[in-house]
């Protein structure tokens, strides 16, 4: 399996460093590589991004959760609902990333209104960035993000602020993210980031029966 480390290297950062780097005009080369890689075609040759996404062991871990095939899981739904209350944000989801699409395994909104669309192409996913990099993606204001301001979620106004914590099995294969977002900019505090990280651990334990 070709790793994301074959992309431009990311240094280790604390939660606050992530926020500072992403909102302060810093252009993360790994994010740029993923953004470009998701738009490459097969004719352009093998890409480290697609090597991660297409890895057979990672895909086996995705499907072994059963969330792609069977849909809603009561305990996962409960954690995702709790995420909205704990972080105080309008939307939260557990999104699984296959080799072709993002799938809502669970989604909740503060208003109770949820769209019918359950799957999205990977170029339209934000969660795929956390899965490929293996690191949280934290965005205070996507309109000011040096890379992702051109993302479809930003252009459509669906996402103003976003946080996605990757969820991996014990072998380190990232299968998806626990994420939360707002249509407006939002500063993610260190406390909120820690809450999301803790809840992602809960989801991991549920879906991998730990």
State where each predicted segment sits.
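Intrinsically disordered, low-complexity terminal regulatory regions
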Residues: 2-121, 193, 198-199, 209-210
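Regulatory loop-to-helix N-cap segments in sensory/regulatory domains
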Residues: 181-198, 207
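A short, aliphatic-rich beta-strand micro-motif
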Residues: 160-169
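Short, basic/aromatic recognition patches
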Residues: 76-81, 149-155
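Sensory beta-strand/linker motifs that couple input domains to effectors
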Residues: 171-182
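A generic "structured core" feature
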Residues: 126, 169, 193, 197-198, ...
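Regulatory sensory and allosteric helical modules in signal-transduction proteins
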Residues: 91, 97-105, 112-154, 160
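Short coil/loop residues immediately preceding or within conserved phosphate-binding loops
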Residues: 89, 162, 175
């Amino acid at each position: 399996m070709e790793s994301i480390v074959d992309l431009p290297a990311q240094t280790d950062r604390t939660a606050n460093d992530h926020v500072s780097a992403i909102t302060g005009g810093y252009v993360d080369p790994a994010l740029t590589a993923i953004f470009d890689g998701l738009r490459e075609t097969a004719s352009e040759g093998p890409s480290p991004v697609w090597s991660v996404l297409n890895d057979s062991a990672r895909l086996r871990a995705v499907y072994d959760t059963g969330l792609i095939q069977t849909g809603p899981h009561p305990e996962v739904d409960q954690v995702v609902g709790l995420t909205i209350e704990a972080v105080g944000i309008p939307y939260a989801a557990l999104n699984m990333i296959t080799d072709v699409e993002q799938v809502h395994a669970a989604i909740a909104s503060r208003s109770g209104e949820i769209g019918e669309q359950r799957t999205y192409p990977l170029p339209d996913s934000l969660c795929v960035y956390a899965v490929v990099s293996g690191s949280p993606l934290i965005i205070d204001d996507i309109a000011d993000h040096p890379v992702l301001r051109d993302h479809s979620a930003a252009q459509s106004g669906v996402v103003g602020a976003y946080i996605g914590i990757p969820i991996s099995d014990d072998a380190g294969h990232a299968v998806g993210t626990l994420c939360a977002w707002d249509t407006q900019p939002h500063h993610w505090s260190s406390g909120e980031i820690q809450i999301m990280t803790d809840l992602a651990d809960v989801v991991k334990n549920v879906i991998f029966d730990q």
